[in-house]
Amino acid sequence: YLKKEKINLAKLKNSGYNSLLGKGSSGGIIFGTSGGVMEATLREVYHILYKRYPKGRLLNFKSIRGTSNVKEAVVKINGTYIKVAIINGTGDARKVIEKIKNKEVYYDFIEVMTCEGGCISGGGQPRVFPLNKNLKDKRMNALYKSDKRMKIRCASMNPDIKDIYDNFFGEVG
């Protein structure tokens, strides 16, 4: 593309960098934990439905946290009950899928993490043997501590994301 457009990088003037997506939300931080994707998504669902950001306990869906292989919860947002499941490991995902097929269970939203406990136990993490529950809990709690300290707790609070929606996509939802 550069050759085609005859752009010579050496002759370009220095300028500031494009900070697009240079900031993140704490919702992205908790993606590393089992239930973190669900929790971040539920925060956004709350924002979309109420047109305001969640506060207090609505920022911390503790019922879906932890390292259990299968977690279920019913979350009430805007008078609507949402049945959710969080699954750790593909073996348990297979079991839950079979239950869904057999109409034994129903969920509105399911999060599946291949690594038990979430990415905190994944291949990209420092390997400590044995990787026990205590270590997983410490990693998980560190991410939740970081989440709690941040000012931008929902993706839609991120000024870069707001700019993208304002200028390209329109309203979220």
What are these regions (language model features)?
Residues 1-173:
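Iron-sulfur-associated redox domains of electron-transfer enzymes in respiratory
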